[in-house]
């Protein structure tokens, strides 16, 4: 299983009223998206479920191009786990879908409440996007989405320790290291220290520590996109760096390795940050262009809301 071939299911609220509505959506999907198909629909509930490998943003825009209002209300993996029941004399196997979904809005969007379930983040003026997270298996997490309004150059997504947006992107801490990774790093450091006790090698040891620290920080990058003139960065990355449930409440930061941006703005336009380098990791990863809180989101069948609690808009 890799990031390009991993199929996911996407549930949407769509204003459909008859079978011809469903048929027109299916036709649009076949013509515009090669890797996504409609697999379920419920006309009375005005809900559809799609399955494929296209970006969720492309799916949403394709359906809206049919002239219908649409919102994503659930995301699920197609991966299943198998368990065996010991109570039966015969081997009874039960398959369960791996579940877990989250969303992170990076950048500024007008009239959205900061920190509200995947809604208002903070960022440089004009930069905005949504990254969706999906627990693809017991050990891997899918990060996918698009961020727009960027300057040409390399941009990287990185999970940071904290989810505090009060001071823009400045108080989000360092790149997050999971407990498993932290234990592994400690073991490696202990081994290195045991093998380097000669005082004459202090300079070499310091150089090695700096190199290892740099590699450690770069290893925290989820994915890197080389932004062109259209100003778009797209990501679809399957990562085994984190336990999915340990990501909720932390943050995702978009770092720019090439371009300088204007100061980050918050929703009240009163943030005086100068986008200064505020950590050692920023010297390696680059400027913090936009950020947002990772918020738990609904899996398929879990979200029955018709009105968004963040901005009060009607879903359909």
Curated annotation (Swiss-Prot):
Pfam families attached to this UniProt entry: Sod_Cu
Segments of this protein annotated with the region Disordered: 179-210
Start and end residues of each HMA domain: 7-71
Annotated PANTHER family: SUPEROXIDE DISMUTASE CU-ZN -RELATED
Bridged cysteine pairs (disulfide): 169-291
Compositional bias annotation for Low complexity: 182-210
Gene3D superfamilies, alphabetized: 3.30.70.100, Superoxide dismutase, copper/zinc binding domain (2.60.40.200)
Subunit structure: Homodimer, and heterodimer with SOD1.
Presence of keyword S-adenosyl-L-methionine: no
Keywords of the record: Chaperone, Copper, Cytoplasm, Disulfide bond, Metal-binding
Record's subcellular location: Cytoplasm
Residue numbers spanned by region Superoxide dismutase-like: 99-298
Cofactor names: Cu(2+)
Protein name (record): Probable copper chaperone for superoxide dismutase
Note on cofactor: Binds 2 copper ions per subunit.
Species, as recorded: Dictyostelium discoideum
A Gene Ontology molecular function term of the record: superoxide dismutase copper chaperone activity
List of residues binding Cu cation 2: 308, 310
Protein purpose: Delivers copper to copper zinc superoxide dismutases.
Keyword Nucleotide-binding: no
């Amino acid at each position: 299983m890799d990031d390009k071939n991993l199929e996911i299911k996407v549930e949407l609220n769509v204003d459909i009223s008859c079978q011809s509505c469903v048929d027109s959506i299916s036709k649009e999907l076949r013509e515009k998206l090669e890797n996504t198909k409609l697999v379920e629909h419920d006309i009375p509930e005005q809900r559809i479920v799609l399955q494929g490998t296209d970006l969720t943003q492309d799916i949403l825009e394709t359906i809206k191009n049919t002239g219908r209002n649409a919102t994503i209300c659930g995301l699920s993996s197609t991966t299943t786990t198998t368990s065996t029941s010991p109570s039966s004399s015969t081997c009874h196997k039960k398959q369960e879908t791996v579940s877990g979904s989250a969303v992170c809005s990076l950048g500024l969007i007008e009239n959205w409440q900061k920190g509200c379930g995947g809604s208002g983040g903070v960022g440089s003026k004009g930069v905005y996007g949504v990254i969706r997270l999906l627990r693809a298996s017991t050990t891997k997490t899918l990060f996918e989405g698009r961020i727009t309004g960027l300057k040409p150059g390399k941009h990287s997504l990185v999970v940071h320790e904290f989810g505090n947006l009060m001071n823009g992107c400045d108080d989000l801490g360092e790149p997050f290291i999971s407990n498993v990774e932290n234990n592994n790093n400690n073991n490696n450091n202990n081994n290195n220290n045991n093998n380097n006790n000669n005082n004459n090698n202090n300079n070499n040891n310091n150089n090695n520590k700096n190199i290892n620290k740099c590699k450690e920080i770069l290893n925290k990058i989820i994915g890197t996109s080389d932004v062109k003139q259209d100003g778009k960065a797209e990501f679809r990355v399957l990562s085994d760096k984190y336990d999915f449930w340990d990501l909720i409440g932390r943050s995702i930061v978009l770092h720019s390795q090439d371009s300088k941006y204007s100061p980050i703005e918050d929703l009240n336009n009163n943030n005086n940050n100068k986008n200064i380098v505020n950590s050692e990791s920023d010297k390696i990863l680059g400027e913090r262009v936009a950020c947002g809180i990772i918020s738990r989101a609904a899996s398929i069948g879990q979200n029955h809301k018709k009105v968004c609690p963040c901005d009060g808009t009607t879903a359909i």
